[in-house]
Amino acid sequence: MTRQLAGAGVAVTVLPATDLYLMGRDRDHNHTRGVLRVHEMLEHGVNCSLSTNNVLNPFTPFGDCSLVRMANLYANTAHAGPRDFSNCLDMVTSRPARLLRRGAYGIEVGKPANLVVLDCKTPEEAVSELAIPLYGFRGGRMSFSRKAVEIHAP
């Protein structure tokens, strides 16, 4: 079926927090919960993304809209290993941009400077350590800044 999805150009988006919160609610024991393992579908050419659309509402009564957190939650629940972490970050950045046909996506001269700077060294670290956003830019203008945590000796 995965090859058919890829061949038809069908993209798949998973909402990890909502899926986990809503699944199994109809049972009184053996609450089966999970998410579609879309990181495995990437290998067959399916464009997959991770997102959240239900925050602080009846479908998901918690959350902070962090897509890095969704990538981390997905990696945990779908048993994605360290070699998949980069793909998990892609599924909240470049892959949704492709799904939305954002041709001007990416960091290159002449493209809109819309980006978030994370406190990490690698894409894998962003997902595994829930990297904190330090700066955000929209159209080349800083839209927010956040100081990095400083640890002091006791």
Language-model segments: what does each one mean?
Residues T2-G9:
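Acidic (Asp/Glu)-rich catalytic clusters
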